[in-house]
Amino acid sequence: MKRRILLVDDELAILLTLKAILEMHHFEVETASSAKEGAQRLTKATYDMVITDMRMETETAGYDVIRAAKAQPYEPAVAVLTAYPSLGSDWKTKGAHSLLVKPVNTDELLRQLEHLLSMHQLNKGKNGKNAPLPRPDKTAKAEKKAI
């Protein structure tokens, strides 16, 4: 069974590139081009993970997607994708589990997503809730391709 990801970003090139990469690696991917559309999709389908850009319609539109994801009974893992990593740890306090910085290379993206999905599933199994997840180690070799 393919794992389902909702990808939310207002940049069409990012959406299409990430969707193609993730589908080549056996993920089922749906996309949304705004926080509003992403929040609506979260209520109409079930996802294993949500990856959202932070800055879309507004500087903090990604937080709307995070809130919508956290409100779902199926508790998807949540990752923030941003070109502006100066968010500090605010993304954690808002409920996201991982921060992905654009441009991200393919190997690093896949490694982080696999780690996040594994840890999220393990934590859901232990306590039925989303617990903070440990960061993956940084020693994996990174492919030169960047998104």
Which role fits each region the language model picked out?
Residues 119-147:
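CheY-like receiver
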Residues 31-49, 57:
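Acidic, metal-coordinating helix/loop segments flanking the phosphotransfer/catalytic sites
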Residues 104-115, 121:
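C-terminal output helix
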Residues 63-64, 83-101, 111:
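Alpha4 helix (beta4-alpha4-beta5 surface) of REC/receiver domains from two-component response regulators
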Residues 11, 55-57:
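The short loop immediately C-terminal to the conserved phospho-acceptor aspartate in CheY-like receiver
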Residues 40, 60-75:
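Short amphipathic alpha-helix used as the core "switch/output" element in two-component signaling
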Residues 79-81:
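Hydrophobic/aromatic residues positioned on beta-strands within the core alpha/beta folds
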Residues 12-30:
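Two-component/phosphorelay signaling modules centered on CheY-like receiver
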